[in-house]
Amino acid sequence: GKGSPILLIHDMLPGGSGYEWGKIEDDLALEHTVYNLDLPGCGRSEKSGITYTNFVYVQAICDFIKNVIGEKTDVIVNGYAVSFVVMACHNEKDLFNKIMMVNPVSLSSLKQMPGKKEKLLRRCLEIPVFGTLVYHMVVSRDAVNNEFIENYAFDPFHPDRDLQDAYYEAAH
């Protein structure tokens, strides 16, 4: 599209990707230049073997706006990714115009430091075979379908199979 830029940023659930915005991209493109970013390790982006931290995502957002969009932009962001955009805006105010937050997670719930149990869990999940096994169990086809039926579907008897497939593929 043509017009002022809008950057779309997906939620940070395991299958999160730019596909989340598919139903509104064309409408937004009638009046805006639309950018749909898959954050590092998500969707169609490379899934390298690094530990993805909040800083990595904040930097990726700022770099994308600077190097790809090249001007102050509006951002529409979903779920857990809201905190990354808020921090990116805090760090580099000149890159952002308006921010629309869809289903934001409470920032106060995100400020907690990991305790001993969380640190142990992280170490266990970083063990190559064990961590991969647990991850694939969490994002198996059945687990994704159940998650959609129980938590995401407006009509659980007629789930959006294309969205489920996109979520599953983005997680793998």
For every predicted segment, state its role:
Residues 1-44:
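Conserved HGGG/HGGXW glycine-rich cap/lid loop of the alpha/beta-hydrolase fold
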Residues 5, 31-33, 72-74, 95-98:
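Structural signature of beta-strand start/N-cap positions in the alpha/beta core
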Residues 8-11, 79, 104:
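Glycine-rich His-Gly loop
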Residues 22, 36-76:
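Active-site loop/oxyanion-hole signature of alpha/beta-hydrolase fold enzymes
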Residues 23, 87-91:
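Active-site signature of alpha/beta-hydrolase-fold catalytic machinery across serine-
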Residues 76-85:
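Gly/Ala-rich beta-loop-alpha elbow adjacent to hydrolase catalytic centers
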Residues 90, 96-131:
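Flexible "cap/lid" loop of the alpha/beta hydrolase fold
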Residues 110-111, 135-172:
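Conserved alpha/beta-hydrolase catalytic His-Asp/Glu region
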